[in-house]
Amino acid sequence: MKKREDTRVVVGMSGGVDSSVTALLLKEQGYDVIGIFMKNWDDSNDSGFCSATEDYEDVERVAQQLGIPYYAVNFEKQYWDKVFTYFLEEYKAGRTPNPDVMCNKEIKFKAFLNHAISLGADYVATGHYAQLQELDGEYRLIKGADANKDQTYFLNALSQKQLSKVMFPLGHLQKAEVRKIAAEAELATATKKDSTGICFIGERDFKEFLQTFLPAQPGRMETMDGIDKGQHDGLMYYTLGQRQGLGIGGAGEPWFVIDKDLERNVLIVGQGYHHPGLYSDGLWATDMNWIAKEERTSPFTCKAKFRYRQEDQGVTVFPKEDGRAFIQFDQPQRAITPGQAVVLYEGDRCIGGGVIDKIHRENA
């Protein structure tokens, strides 16, 4: 075993409080710490929006406070090729992608990890709220102690090889404790607001942003029975279960997006939160990743999340060949969204996940 002072840990620093405290804790524990700021998005063309510059200045301030070396590394090309292109393709296909899962898989724990290793890193560390356990040479991904902040949902696509090189120093902490540690150490980012939204969009208007890259194709809105309900702005702007922005007036319960008919460019809508068209009994998933050393091949029961922060739901998983799985729900689920991640759990252990491809209804 290497001594701590001889163990180099490269921390992915975003300019936020979580990654700042990650660097602080590792430094206090005696590791050889280097901070790296990942520049994934070229925002030089975005008028009036340049949070990356501010974020890097915060990284500089914190790194100087901690007395650790820091660098900025540009991953714009990898990000465009691996994350953003995927993001656009999914929207074109009428789905609602989850770029965070892809960003973790391809950028933070691949491009960044490889770069860190080239700097002589033994490990990389991030401010994710997740925990790792090693048992007989196998790495287990465990939910973060703060149930409200647990981020294993976004880490479901990682491999044993990646996890063997990773540290999550915040995994055992509550968010409030992290803020307290930052305040006590007087870190420059102690009171900085948590970032929201997709990393490359920041706080901008999503519709406007998407229009820059994908031309909108307006079309009709209809009920499941084919009754005309007006016009939509472009299928890519809507997600299943969405209520806002439909512009359907009249009395009675609100209207929701139920489905997208890509061939006809029609948005299918239904009235009422519990409209039967919003519910499904199962789903097909693609790109299944099994975190354990051994791949699952026979059916089993476990828990699942179909969106971030959702309560765990009971399911039966039927793994298929070619990286697909059929996942049957114990209870019908509302507004399952193709393109999002389905993530599987046994107790607090995240065992893997995949991409929701299509929903299944028993009576359809």
Swiss-Prot record:
Keyword annotations: ATP-binding, Cytoplasm, Disulfide bond, Nucleotide-binding, RNA-binding, Transferase, tRNA processing, tRNA-binding
Top EC category: transferase
Main location: cytoplasm
Annotated GO biological process: tRNA wobble position uridine thiolation
Keyword ATP-binding: yes
Catalytic reactions on record: S-sulfanyl-L-cysteinyl-[protein] + uridine(34) in tRNA + AH2 + ATP = 2-thiouridine(34) in tRNA + L-cysteinyl-[protein] + A + AMP + diphosphate + H(+)
GO terms, molecular function: ATP binding; tRNA binding; tRNA-uridine 2-sulfurtransferase activity
CDD domains for this protein: MnmA_TRMU-like (cd01998)
Localisation per UniProt entry: Cytoplasm
Disulfide links within the chain: C103-C199
Site feature (Interaction with tRNA) residues: H128, Q340
Region entry Interaction with target base in tRNA, spans: 98-100
Keyword Disulfide bond annotated: yes
GO cellular component: cytoplasm
Catalytic-site annotation from UniProt: C103 (nucleophile), C199 (cysteine persulfide intermediate)
Domain of life: Bacteria
Gene3D superfamilies in UniProt: Adenine nucleotide alpha hydrolases-like domains, HUPs, Translation factors
EC number: 2.8.1.13
Region: Interaction with tRNA, residue numbers: 149-151, 307-308
Record-linked NCBIfam families: PRK00143.1, trmU
Protein name: tRNA-specific 2-thiouridylase MnmA
Gene: mnmA
